[in-house]
C-alpha cells in the first residue's frame, strides 16, 4: 500500500500493474493483456442482497504499456477510474435491466437463453488474460484467533491462473490459484514485488 501511495495509485491498480508487467515478461507473444477486476457495486448502489453484487472492469494493457511497473500501475489506475465512473456503471446497469424486461427475451425458451449465455461467456473469456480480485480488509473478532485469510479464485481450462488478495491484521495475502503445474507467473510476480522493495514471505 505504501508503494502504491508513492506513485498515486490504489492498491488494486498497483497489484494489477505488477501482475500485467509480470505476465508480459513471461509471454513470448507480445499481445494486449487484459486483467479483469471485480468491482463491488454496494458502495455506489446500497443493497441488502446476499447475492454477488459486482461487475467486472477489463483493464487492457497494450504492448507499448510495459515500460515499468509504475507505468503499468498508473495505466491501470487511469482505466479503473474511467470504467468505474458512476455514469458508466449507471448505463451498464440500465442496459442489463432493459434486457431482462424485454418481452422478446421473456418468451424465448430457457434452454435457448442458457445456450446464448454460455456462448457469451466463452466470448468474454477469450478476451481476458487473468482475473485479479482484491477482497480488501477483513476484520475478525480476536476471539476467532484468525491470523490470515487466503482468497482462492475459481479457474477453468480457459482461465488457468487467477490472483486473489485479502488483508487482515495489517497483512495482505496474495494467492495464485492455478489449474496448471507451471509456476513461472507466480515466481515472476513475487520477484517483481521484491524488486520494488516489498517484503514477500
Language-model regions, residue ranges each:
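Generic structural signal for individual residues within well-ordered alpha-helical segments
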Residues: 1, 15-16, 187
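Flexible, P/S/T/G-rich "lid" or insertion loops adjacent to the active sites of thioester-utilizing
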Residues: 1-9
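Short amphipathic alpha-helical segments
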Residues: 11-20
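Acyl-thioester-dependent acyl-group transfer interface
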Residues: 24-201
Amino acid at each position: 500500500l505504501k508503494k502504491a501511495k508513492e506513485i498515486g495509485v490504489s492498491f488494486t491498480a498497483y497489484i494489477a500493474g505488477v501482475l500485467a508487467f509480470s505476465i508480459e515478461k513471461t509471454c513470448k507473444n507480445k499481445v494486449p493483456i487484459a486483467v479483469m477486476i471485480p468491482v463491488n457495486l454496494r458502495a455506489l448502489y446500497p443493497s441488502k442482497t446476499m447475492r454477488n453484487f459486482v461487475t467486472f472492469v477489463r483493464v487492457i494493457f497494450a504492448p507499448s504499456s510495459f515500460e515499468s511497473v509504475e507505468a503499468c500501475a498508473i495505466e491501470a489506475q487511469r482505466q479503473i477510474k474511467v470504467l468505474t465512473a458512476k455514469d458508466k456503471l449507471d448505463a451498464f446497469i440500465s442496459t442489463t435491466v432493459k434486457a431482462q424486461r424485454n418481452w422478446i427475451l421473456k418468451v424465448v425458451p430457457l434452454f435457448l437463453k442458457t445456450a446464448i449465455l454460455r456462448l457469451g461467456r466463452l466470448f468474454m473469456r477469450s478476451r481476458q488474460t487473468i482475473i485479479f480480485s482484491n477482497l480488501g480488509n477483513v476484520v475478525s473478532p480476536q476471539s476467532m484467533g484468525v491470523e490470515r485469510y487466503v482468497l482462492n479464485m475459481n479457474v477453468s481450462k480457459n482461465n488457468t491462473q487467477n490472483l486473489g488478495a485479502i488483508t487482515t491484521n495489517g497483512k495482505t495475502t496474495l494467492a495464485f490459484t492455478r489449474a496448471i503445474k507451471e509456476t513461472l507467473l507466480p515466481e515472476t510476480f513475487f520477484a517483481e514485488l521484491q524488486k520494488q522493495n516489498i517484503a514477500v514471505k
